Amino acid sequence: MSTAAIPGAPLPVRTPGSRARGRHRRPERPEIPAGSPALLLAVPAAAGPESRPVVEELLSIVRSEQNGVRTAAGYLPSGDGGASGERTVAELLTEAAEAGLPAPVVVPLVPGPHDFLPELHRLAAEYGAPVTDALGPHPLLAEGVHVRLSEAGLARADRARLFAIATAADGVVLTTVGGQAAADAAGITGMLLAARLAVPVVAAALDLPGSVADAVAHLKEMGAQNPALAPLVIGPEADAELLATAAEESGCPSAAPLGAYQAVGQLLASTYLAALPAVAPEAGADESDADEADGTRAGGRHAAQ
């Protein structure tokens, strides 16, 4: 029996099937050059029972997506004197420098602008470590939010399935943290989500007073009768109380945060790969010289024959 026949079962979001073999096969994953820097996931929270499982699962996805990558998670200082056993970004950067390793590529675990980014950039600059952009806006984030809405019964799994869901929302407030800058950036992901859902989507900041309420009111002015909240939040970057308070004060149902969604891990891996330094010109020149020498020797052998 399919899940569509089970009342209350979440509908799976349709994803593209595997590509055909031969010339249409899926491109191979790029290999990580030897000696490449590690991926340092910068978590905007202290290590704890809420943040640690999400972070560990995401890093597991990254390693499964890209064999050979070295990963580590750096948290904010927790004030427990290191009792949690988890290290901070500063400690990991210091360890890499003292060991003579390349400065790791720092990937912030946030979907958009966040208050902890300026300090992170300052800290990384002290060690010469590159910091990537935030993960969003990106279509994979819109996909993840769509999945969470579907799991909560607040959206169709895809537009091709036209049967009705009694609790489906007719408008969505895409909530995030990071103030107005984060809400503005989330608007782009909101446009991608609106195209998937075929309902209006308005972005709002959970940490900006009145932002969510204004977004809900705007949707109702547009004719929405059953608006819902959809967190553009991975998890560690937002206080759980902000999410609960927004749902309670707005009177709107809410989907779950993105959490350790598979596509978020894939996005982390691709963000890291894009930031890897290019092969050193000297190494490339040496390889070219070696290839040219091999070709010259081969040509000489053919001439002798």
Predicted segments, located by residue:
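Active-site-proximal alpha-helix that buttresses catalytic centers in soluble enzyme cores
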Residues: 1-305
